[in-house]
Amino acid sequence: MPTLRTGFAVPLLLILIATLVSAQKTGPSDAEYIAQALSAAPEAVAKAAAVVRMEKDGKITTLREGKNGFSCMVIGGGEKMCADANSMEFFDAWAKHQPPPNKLGLTYMLSGYDVGGSNTEPYAMSKTADNHWVVTGPHVMIVGPASKSLGLTSTTDVDPAKPYMMWVGTPYEHAMIPVGSDKTKPKPVAERK
């Protein structure tokens, strides 16, 4: 049986390994991910925020330690979020279908990349004829049961350019507060990075 000479085998093996490693790596580099995640918050908050990434197995990896109690990440379909500790508890409870903590939390989603969400169904993953899908664009969220006391509109069909309550009547009801002008609209999907 013919064999490859060592002079060919080693470079060929290295190319094969590099190709396999490259094919297995998905998503942005850590540096790219950090930059994307930090785009969710104002610069003053982003400078001292932690950056975390949820791995495919559900494990949270800290890419950068923080100093101000905020954690920034890329979520779902690429949306960027920067949340304080109370908000992180709120979203953890939501993910586990558990009652949220009785604490107010602040979350920034300022990057302008918003794939939207159901205004009525906390676990809806896509638009349907009756789940009142809304795309808000850049916004902040006030989460926690006390957010109801803000007195914002709680209709199901909202104007996403004005503050409103999302997921009304569920334990995860929270305030959505758009920022920027009413002309601020998310970029088309093809233009998003």
Residue ranges and their predicted role:
Residues K25-K193:
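Primary mode marks residue(s) on the alpha4-beta5-alpha5 output face of response regulator receiver
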Residues M1-P11:
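Bacterial N-terminal signal peptides that target proteins for export
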Residues A9-T19:
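Bacterial N-terminal signal peptides
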